């Protein structure tokens, strides 16, 4: 890596033989130069008389094999202008520059460029930004879905590792601070890794124009092509296939009203703890999890295949009879009166309930209420009946949809990805295909719940602006889109079916149940529950075979074999292992010990949190005692950073760690500071647990 020199850059660019490919965006033909480039910065965060101040002290840029670095923004701006002049780039002729976690670099440099367009997934979360110079910055982090170290580890054509520990971020550095060869190598490799990663993406997609923006976009592209097109060219070579699928989509439409109901009905995975076990140190705890839970229900269950139709007769008797009908599903509002949990676990999410009267809440879940209103599916209703008692229920805004298996191209896409994930693991020479299929099978569900009406976030006059989308307009665009291959209600039922499957385990395991998280359960007395596990596994396999029969698919597709000949059936409970000790303090808060300590605590680094707890305790028991509702970890031991966005120009005299003082100017920045972590329970949850301990909550009854 060399220090940036304009003439050396020009000499290198002149030596390149670059082709151009074209892509249409909003009907306009855009030229892209087939060249790989990446950019990264190193920054310092400090405080001056209590004022947070952050700035860039080193940047690294790579284009193919040319890697250079600089120490101030003026050098980088000159480099960008040199690229523009050499390639004659503009909004219609572009060069893509990948940045790993673009949102971070963007905050430091957004005032330095004139922006043609900024596409962001959220406020301050840009993933594609086009300058008037024709330089298009893209985020490689949201494409890979992995941090830089894991991105490097997963490379299959290149052998390169992220340097770790070679750059001490606690030291104050400025553009005048000397950097050692080791420190510069750290900076160089961060850019080289991204270049290697994008080269592998180009090898896969053949051109930079075909690389999706996001990891979810990758699987979306793959499944869409299988649904709408034939052959690898993805041209409409089979007109009947394209038109048949388009006809299906034209019959699967929403209105603004049904879309809003879908939004209310949608819930994610179920994560919670048995309140009877919270705070206890439990021994010999077992863990089971579903193999590919969401893909399994996408294959085994039936989904809405008609436009939602409102029905009038909504008495309880009529509705419960409707729920028993085959090949129909429902979404609706339900008002429950005098509803109380009859289990040590609670299903209804407080955030999904409205008009609550005298609710008692168990860590975000409804334990009891005099009355409440919620929007649910018929699948949710059956779970509620199994785990709550209620005096009455009133239904309203009920919509009925005919159900059938998902279209065959979606089914075969999922099966193909699962087969590759299973059969290619550990096969020499197939690492890239294995990693791709593994990432895509995990993203299949995500594409099914992508929101139709999203806020638009962009930069206007260097200010972030959020624009509300017009629901009617977006729904109309959705209904008439010729590229659409999904139906939003499908995703709603994916999670509903997955929750039902999880709750089959919670209910069957009963008092031995401890904790669940989306697709896994922790519990006691494994031997006592083996019959349930075996029965469930036979049941889900039977359902998957029914789907195979329907589409004339081989049974081997739902249970492919590894390269060692071991069958890996889809959707079954898989035994994860036994923990010597386990303790939970609520959702996303648990600790277990097998031969080492492990923690999952929302907001706390797993590795650094474990290291700190170990450093404070002399025994395993001490570690579990330390993990309590008053646990506090100092800033130096959490691995957490507080991000402070600074949009104002600042300049200060800064003295670096070597004693060198210089005037530093910063147009905008992100200040990072270590922050402490304190584990605490909400007052409402503490009160609920106290009521249970004191006997006010017992056997499905709340005593005043």
Segments (PLM) and residue ranges:
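Conserved DEDDh/DEDDy metal-dependent 3′-5′ exonuclease domain
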Residues: 63-173, 185-189, 193
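N-terminal accessory regions of nucleic-acid-interacting proteins
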Residues: 1-37, 41
């Amino acid at each position: 890596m060399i220090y940036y020199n304009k003439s050396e850059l020009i000499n290198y660019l002149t030596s390149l033989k670059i082709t151009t490919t074209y892509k249409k965006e909003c009907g306009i033909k855009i030229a892209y130069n087939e060249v790989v480039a990446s950019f990264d910065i190193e920054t310092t965060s400090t405080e001056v008389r209590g004022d947070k101040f952050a700035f860039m002290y080193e940047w690294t840029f790579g284009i193919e094999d040319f890697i250079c670095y600089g120490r101030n923004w003026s050098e980088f701006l000159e480099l960008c202008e040199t690229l523009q002049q050499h390639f004659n780039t503009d909004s219609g002729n572009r060069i893509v520059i990948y940045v790993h976690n673009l949102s971070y670099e963007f905050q430091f440099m957004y005032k330095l460029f004139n922006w043609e367009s900024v596409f962001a997934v959220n406020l301050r979360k840009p993933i594609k930004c086009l300058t008037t110079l024709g330089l298009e910055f893209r985020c490689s982090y949201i494409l890979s879905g992995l941090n830089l170290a894991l991105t490097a580890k997963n490379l299959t054509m290149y052998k390169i590792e992220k340097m770790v520990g070679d750059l001490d971020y606690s030291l104050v550095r400025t553009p005048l601070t000397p950097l050692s060869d080791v420190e510069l190598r750290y900076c160089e490799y961060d850019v080289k890794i991204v270049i290697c990663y994008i080269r592998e993406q180009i090898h896969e997609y053949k051109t930079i124009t075909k690389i999706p923006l996001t990891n979810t976009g990758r699987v979306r592209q793959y499944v869409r092509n299988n649904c709408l097109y034939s052959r690898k060219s993805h041209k409409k070579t089979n007109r009947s296939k394209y038109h048949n699928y388009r006809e299906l989509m034209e019959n699967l439409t929403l209105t603004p009203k049904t879309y809003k109901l879908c939004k209310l009905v949608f819930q994610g995975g179920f994560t919670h703890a048995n309140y009877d076990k919270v705070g206890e140190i439990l021994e010999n705890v077992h863990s089971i999890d579903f193999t590919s839970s969401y893909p399994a229900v996408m294959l085994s269950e039936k989904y809405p295949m008609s436009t939602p139709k409102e029905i009038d007769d909504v008495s309880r008797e009529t509705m419960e009879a409707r729920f028993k009908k085959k090949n129909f599903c429902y979404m609706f509002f339900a008002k429950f009166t005098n509803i109380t949990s009859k289990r040590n676990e609670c299903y209804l999410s407080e955030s999904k309930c409205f008009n609550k009267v005298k609710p008692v809440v168990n860590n975000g879940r409804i334990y009891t209420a005099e009355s409440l209103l919620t929007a649910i599916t018929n699948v949710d209703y059956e779970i509620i009946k199994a785990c709550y008692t209620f005096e009455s229920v009133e239904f309203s805004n009920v919509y009925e949809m005919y159900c059938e298996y998902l279209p065959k191209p979606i089914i075969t896409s999922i099966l193909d990805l699962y087969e590759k994930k299973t059969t290619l693991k550990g096969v020499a020479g197939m690492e890239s295909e294995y990693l791709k299929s593994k990432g895509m099978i995990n993203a299949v569900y995500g594409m099914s719940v992508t929101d139709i009406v999203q806020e638009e976030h962009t930069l206007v006059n260097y200010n972030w602006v959020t624009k509300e989308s017009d629901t009617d307009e977006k729904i109309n665009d959705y209904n008439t889109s010729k590229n659409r291959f999904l139906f939003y209600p499908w995703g709603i039922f994916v999670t509903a079916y997955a929750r039902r499957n999880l709750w089959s385990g919670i209910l069957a395991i009963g008092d031995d149940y401890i904790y669940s998280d989306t697709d896994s359960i922790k519990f006691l007395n494994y031997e006592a529950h083996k019959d349930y596990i075996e029965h469930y596994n036979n049941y889900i396999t039977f359902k998957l075979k029914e789907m195979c029969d329907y589409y004339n698919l081989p049974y081997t597709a739902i249970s492919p074999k590894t390269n060692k000949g071991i069958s890996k059936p889809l959707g079954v409970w898989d035994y994860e292992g036994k923990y010597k000790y386990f303790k939970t303090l609520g959702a996303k808060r648990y600790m277990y010990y097998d031969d080492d300590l492990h923690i999952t605590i929302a907001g706390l680094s797993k590795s650094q949190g474990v290291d700190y707890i170990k450093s404070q305790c002399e025994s395993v028991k001490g570690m579990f005692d330390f993990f309590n509702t008053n646990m506090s970890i100092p800033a130096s031991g959490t691995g957490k950073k507080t991000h402070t966005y600074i949009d104002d120009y600042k300049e200060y005299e800064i003295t670096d760690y070597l004693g060198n003082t210089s005037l530093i100017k910063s147009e905008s920045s992100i200040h990072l500071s270590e922050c402490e972590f304190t584990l605490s329970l909400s007052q409402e949850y503490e009160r609920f647990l106290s009521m249970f301990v004191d006997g006010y909550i017992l056997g499905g009854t709340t005593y005043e």
